[in-house]
Amino acid sequence: MSRTVMCRKYHEELPGLDRPPYPGAKGEDIYNNVSRKAWDEWQKHQTMLINERRLNMMNAEDRKFLQQEMDKFLSGEDYAKADGYVPPSA
C-alpha cells in the first residue's frame, strides 16, 4: 500500500512520493506535503519552462526562477506558463 499525503496543491489525500526529490528541508517538505500527481505534473511543466524559455540550469538566475515557479506551482498559486501554450482539452 502506498503512503498518502494531504497534497498542498490539490487539498486532498493523494498517493505521495516514494522518497524526497531533493536533499535537505526542501525535499522533506515536498515529500510530506506534495502528491505524486502534483510532482509528476510539475516535472512536465518544468521541462516545458526550461525548453520554451531556454533556461540554462548552469545560470543561477534561471535556477532561482525555476525554484520560485516550482514553489508557486506546488502551492496552487498562479505560476509562469510557456508563451502560447494551450492545454489539451479533455
UniProtKB/Swiss-Prot annotation:
Keywords: Iron. The keyword DNA damage does not apply. Gene3D superfamilies: Fe(II) trafficking protein YggX (1.10.3880.10). Pfam families: Iron_traffic. It comes from the Bacteria. GO terms for molecular function: iron ion binding. The keyword Iron applies. InterPro entries: Fe_traffick_prot_YggX (IPR007457), Fe_traffick_prot_YggX_sf (IPR036766). One of its GO terms (cellular component) is cytosol. One of its GO terms (biological process) is cellular response to oxidative stress. Could be a mediator in iron transactions between iron acquisition and iron-requiring processes, such as synthesis and/or repair of Fe-S clusters in biosynthetic enzymes. PANTHER family: FE(2+)-TRAFFICKING PROTEIN-RELATED. Belongs to the Fe(2+)-trafficking protein family. This is Probable Fe(2+)-trafficking protein. It comes from Pseudomonas aeruginosa (strain ATCC 15692 / DSM 22644 / CIP 104116 / JCM 14847 / LMG 12228 / 1C / PRS 101 / PAO1).
